[in-house]
Curated annotation (Swiss-Prot):
GO terms for biological process: tRNA N1-guanine methylation. This is tRNA (guanine-N(1)-)-methyltransferase. Specifically methylates guanosine-37 in various tRNAs. Coiled coil: none annotated. Pfam families: tRNA_m1G_MT. The gene is trmD.
Length: 263
């Protein structure tokens, strides 16, 4: 996979040189290029922003440097359009499913906006050469797109074959099956007067699997009930449904619903 990141603060992306993503780059599992947007300006001050038409606070990123920067990363002979991700609080909310979609692509480009954002004409212009996906990390505002891009790059790149040492670990993480991950424990089994759940010492793999599944369901119901409404009850077994009933959920018209919301 090839990834290109465009930013006015290329040094901000230095953490991508570390840990698993940095090692994946060294091992040739992914190609990651960081570009300085100011290198595509044409004035001596290397200006990348200007005042907004219509008035208002802040500055807007100029279109021409962005057009030149984006054009520089397009491969004319590519079989498919690269995906252009534009971090924006007005974009679709990034999640694990989107990370999986992006991990299946061959070329991703990330446009790190600053100030009040990038001139909207750039987004429209880019659609001819890119599949454009404005993307948000959540319902809050950051100073720029770099933090969001680092999160999205890591969430996506770690799904590539060979990046994570044990691929089975990817199957047991939060959100992989639409639920939060179960709690985990390590040695010692007794710590400051607190013991780990006894079932984890039983050696009974079926009981351990059931315990972990139950904890996933309880934790999701407590912390992220919104995820349960997106879950297909058809994939749940009787034990799953029993745990959810204890947590205050029933299946109504094919949707998991809080019992407190029923008349």
């Amino acid at each position: 996979m090839r990834l290109d990141v465009i930013s006015i603060f290329p040094d901000y992306l230095a953490p991508l040189e570390l840990s698993l993503i940095g090692k994946a780059r060294q091992d040739g599992l992914l190609e990651l290029n960081v570009h300085d947007l100011r290198a595509f300006t044409t004035d001596r001050h290397r200006t990348v922003d200007d005042t907004p038409y219509g008035g208002g606070a802040g500055m807007v990123m100029k279109p021409e440097p962005w057009a030149l920067a984006l054009a520089s990363v397009v491969e004319p002979a590519a079989k498919s359009k690269p995906v252009l991700i534009v971090p924006s609080p007005a974009g679709e909310v990034f999640n694990q499913r989107i990370a999986e979609e992006l991990a299946a692509e061959s070329h991703l480009v990330f446009a790190c906006g600053r100030y009040e954002g990038i001139d909207e004409r750039v987004v429209d212009w880019a659609r001819e050469s890119f599949t454009v996906r404005p993307m948000s990390l959540g319902d809050y505002v950051l100073n720029g797109g770099e933090v969001a891009v680092m999160a999205m790059v890591e969430a996506t790149a770690r799904l590539l074959p060979g990046v994570v040492g044990n691929p089975d670990s990817l199957l047991e993480e939060s959100h992989q099956d639409g639920l939060l991950e179960y709690p985990v424990y390590t040695k010692p089994s007794a710590w400051r007067g607190v013991d780990i759940p006894a079932v984890l010492l039983s050696g009974n793999h079926a009981k351990i699997a059931r315990f972990r599944r139950d904890e996933q369901l309880r934790r999701t119901a407590q912390r992220r009930p919104d995820l349960l409404t997106q879950l297909d009850p058809a994939i749940l077994d009787r034990a799953d449904l029993a745990v959810l009933r204890e947590s205050g959920y029933l299946t109504v018209d094919g949707v998991l619903t809080r019992t407190s919301e029923l008349g």
